[in-house]
């Protein structure tokens, strides 16, 4: 049977009933837009309507992994009834089967022969293109304009970045994104827009677009992590200021032996590894160290000139700073001027920024703390 979508084009003339076929074709659109979980869900929906829908089983196989030790693609393919597949479905089945053994020769020959026999198949033309070539994506969009959301998605990247004969053009890239969104209802195109905006330093657009992607699955979404990253990039100065304050507050908590305050800045799941300015061995700093009786009393202690550097994904911060002060030995009463340079590493966790490393060393003409 031939089932046309509302726009007169479909991915595959499948072996499912009329209602299931519409769902299956939407499912392939999700595959083409790298929305595998949604494609899998569409396939399950099709099977609820038509439990003999073999194309839905192929979609589930296409959405899952071919990895032998943990993937379930083989299991999904074993459930397919080959006798009920049409010619295009059989080509797709054989291609998926070849991925189980990384048999690229069989994969490519099956696709090539399948295209010769089915030159107007949208699915096979999609699988045959080089996704990283602008011209291949444009050719598919010209042939199948109503199924080209994935092609417009890839072209948006290629136009925004330029190269391979394509001039970079951000406005045109956003036009490609709009075309993709008009053709397909899914989150990945908004993730694409966010990534392109971020690459061009527009973190406000990146954040708003990423949140649109996240909104498709507000719990457990794969898009949330980047939304958090873009928020941090957009608010980089504020985050840096808060880290500077946290570094000072943490050190004050150590000097005052304030457990509750100190706990705010460390994680129960990560060690705080410290190298003191006495240049002794590195060690894990714990509450036992915090409460240890010291050989000295601090007369003054000030941290200054803090600089903050972030990892590219905004999950880690590196702080460099200097500390000046003075302390007095409890036993002898001797006073010593203290001058060090230091660095600290903080990581972003679900419970906020936490310190995991600090390294202190005396300045060239300075003195650190004594051996404890």
Language model feature labels by segment:
Residues 19, 28, 53-54, 62, 87, 96, 120-123, 130, ...:
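Residue-level recognition of tetratricopeptide repeat
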Residues 339-369:
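Short beta-strand edge/turn micro-motifs at domain boundaries
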Residues 71-84, 105-115, 136-148, 168-181, ...:
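Alpha-helical repeat scaffolds
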Residues 232-268, 369-372:
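Short, low-complexity N-terminal intrinsically disordered segments enriched in polar/charged residues
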Residues 16-45, 49, 90-102, 127:
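Alpha-helical segment of the N-proximal tetratricopeptide repeat
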Residues 33, 67, 101, 134-135, ...:
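Structural motif corresponding to the intra-repeat A-B loop/turn of tetratricopeptide repeats
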Residues 259-313, 322, 337:
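A solvent-exposed, acidic/Ser-Thr-rich amphipathic alpha-helical stretch
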């Amino acid at each position: 049977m031939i089932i046309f979508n509302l726009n007169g084009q479909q991915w595959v003339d499948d072996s499912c009933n009329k209602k299931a076929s519409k769902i299956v074709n939407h499912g392939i659109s999700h595959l083409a837009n790298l929305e595998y979980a949604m494609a899998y869900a569409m396939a399950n929906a099709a099977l609820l309507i038509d439990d003999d829908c073999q194309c839905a089983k192929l979609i589930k196989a296409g959405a899952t992994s071919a990895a032998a030790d943990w993937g379930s693609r083989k299991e999904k393919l074993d459930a397919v009834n080959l006798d009920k597949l049409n010619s295009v479905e059989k080509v797709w089945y054989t291609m998926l089967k070849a991925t189980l053994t990384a048999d690229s020769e069989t994969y490519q020959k099956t696709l090539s022969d399948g295209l010769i026999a089915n030159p107007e198949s949208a699915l096979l033309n999609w699988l045959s293109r080089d996704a990283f070539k602008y011209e291949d994506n444009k050719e598919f969009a010209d042939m199948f304009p109503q199924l080209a959301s994935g092609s417009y998605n890839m072209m948006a990247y290629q136009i925004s970045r330029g190269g391979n004969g394509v001039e970079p053009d951000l406005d045109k890239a956003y036009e490609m994104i709009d075309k993709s969104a008009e053709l397909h209802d899914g989150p990945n195109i908004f993730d694409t827009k966010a990534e392109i905006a971020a690459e061009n330093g527009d973190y406000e657009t990146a954040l708003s677009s990423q949140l649109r992607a996240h909104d498709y699955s507000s719990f457990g979404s794969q898009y949330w992590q980047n939304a958090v990253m873009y928020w941090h990039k957009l608010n980089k100065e504020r985050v840096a200021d808060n880290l500077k304050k946290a570094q000072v507050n943490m050190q004050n908590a150590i000097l005052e032996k304030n457990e509750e305050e100190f706990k705010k800045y460390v994680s129960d799941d990560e060690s705080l590894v410290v190298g003191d300015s006495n240049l002794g061995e590195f060690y894990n700093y714990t509450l036992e160290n915090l409460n240890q009786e010291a050989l000295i009393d601090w007369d003054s202690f000030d941290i200054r000139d803090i600089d903050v550097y972030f990892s590219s994904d905004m999950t880690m911060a590196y702080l460099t700073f200097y500390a000046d002060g003075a302390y007095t030995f409890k036993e002898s009463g001797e006073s010593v001027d203290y001058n060090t340079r230091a660095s600290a590493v903080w990581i972003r966790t679900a419970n906020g920024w936490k310190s995991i490393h600090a390294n202190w060393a005396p300045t060239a003409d300075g003195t650190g703390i004594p051996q404890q």
